[in-house]
Swiss-Prot record:
Protein name: Anthranilate phosphoribosyltransferase
EC number: 2.4.2.18
InterPro entries, alphabetized: Anthranilate_Pribosyl_Tfrase, Glycosyl_Trfase_fam3, Glycosyl_Trfase_fam3_N_dom, Glycosyl_Trfase_fam3_N_dom_sf, Nuc_phospho_transferase
Organism taxonomic ancestry: Bacteria, Pseudomonadati, Pseudomonadota, Gammaproteobacteria, Enterobacterales
Molecular function GO labels: anthranilate phosphoribosyltransferase activity; magnesium ion binding
Keywords per UniProt: Amino-acid biosynthesis, Aromatic amino acid biosynthesis, Glycosyltransferase, Magnesium, Metal-binding, Transferase, Tryptophan biosynthesis
Family matches, as NCBIfam families: trpD
Domain of life: Bacteria
Name of encoding gene: trpD
Keyword check for Cytoplasm: no
Disulfide cross-links: none
Any one Gene Ontology cellular component term annotated for this protein: cytosol
Record carries keyword Glycosyltransferase: yes
Length: 333
């Protein structure tokens, strides 16, 4: 079976969703030789992965994931692929705490850094938040605090089989876009940032195949976030239909700031930057960046007015309430 799929890929043909699921199920079980895995990933990359192939791979990884007790209530993920090369502060991580303060639930799936000096997990560890919280403890945090973090390596042990090949290839592959699609809590809503504008629509189409209820995929001026220095490309999935549009900082009622204003640092520096921000004492550019991302996330919950949402987020940031959730989550260690 595998040989048939290899030959198909080497003829630059696309796999069906089912074929991709079979192939990636074998990959996470460690059944491919490193040379076979490298050949598969590169042949898919050169041709361009289809939404059906990405969805099949995501389904294989979700089927292999450790169990998380999925809640009945609405909850979301806010996550980027990373790898945008901008080394910005952890906007999506800060946004998760602010969104929870605004009254919505966020189960954030994260990992250590891809391109910035500090990924979401690096930052959380710097705040004293345990990365190895059990699924049950994380679910309780989601219930009580409105926010929890699910550390990818804890739930996706099969990823390790691909790691040596990925490190040797030193190029982006399908695995770089899979992270945001394989949240073990299986959220019905998601705001997903991607490192390239070419990925915005294909990833939205993938989310449709995966059965998300409502989601937005974004790329803003080189960043895997909603941008405040440039227009943001959006593909929004809403009950099976996808709408593509552009957003500017002005659509949120926010000022523009240069990308340099969002420069991040090492985990400890980022921790200090975000601690000040979430206590209401941060830079105005940082607050605006988080407010824009929270505003779009709130839209997925049916709060359609982006200006109102951004204002609500800014009020939460200035009140310092978001930081209370950071300390409360750290206290659960």
């Amino acid at each position: 079976m595998m040989q048939h799929l290899f030959e198909k890929l080497f003829r630059a043909e696309s796999m069906s969703q089912e074929e991709s699921q079979q192939l990636f199920a074998a990959i996470v079980r460690g059944e491919l030789e490193p040379s076979q895995l490298a050949a598969v990933l590169i042949s898919m990359k050169v041709r361009g992965e289809t939404p059906a192939e990405i969805a099949g791979a995501a389904q294989a990884l979700l089927a292999d994931a450790q169990h998380f007790p999925r809640p009945d209530y609405l909850f979301a993920d806010i996550v980027g692929t990373g790898g945008d090369g901008t080394n910005s502060i952890n906007i999506s991580t800060a946004s998760a705490f602010v969104a929870a303060s605004c009254g919505v639930k966020v189960a954030k799936h994260g990992n250590r850094s891809v391109s910035s000096r500090s990924g979401s997990s690096d930052l959380l560890a710097a705040f004293g938040i345990r990365l190895d919280m059990s699924a049950e403890q994380s679910r309780l945090a989601l219930d009580d605090l409105g926010v929890c973090f699910l550390f990818a390596p804890q739930y996706h042990t099969g990823f390790r089989h691909a790691m040596p090949v990925r490190q040797q290839l030193k190029t982006r592959t399908l695995f770089n876009v899979l992270g945001p699609l394989i949240n073990p809590a299986r959220p019905p809503l998601a705001l997903i940032g991607v490192y390239s504008p070419e990925l915005v629509l294909p990833i939205a189409q993938t989310l449709k195949v995966l059965g998300y209820q409502r989601a937005a995929v974004v790329h803003g001026g080189g960043m895997d976030e909603v941008a405040i220095h440039a227009p943001t490309q959006v593909a929004e999935l809403n009950n099976g239909s996808i709408e593509s549009y552009q957003l500017t900082p002005e659509d949120f009622g926010l000022n523009r700031y240069p990308l340099a204003a969002l420069q991040g640092g090492m985990p400890e520096e980022n921790r200090d930057i975000l601690a000040r921000l979430l206590q209401g004492k941060g830079e105005t550019a940082h607050a605006a960046a988080v407010a824009a991302n929270v505003a779009l996330l709130l839209k997925l919950y049916g709060q359609e007015n982006l200006r109102h949402n951004a204002q609500q987020a800014l009020e939460m940031i200035h009140s310092g309430q978001a930081f209370d959730r950071v300390t409360a989550l750290a206290a659960r260690g």
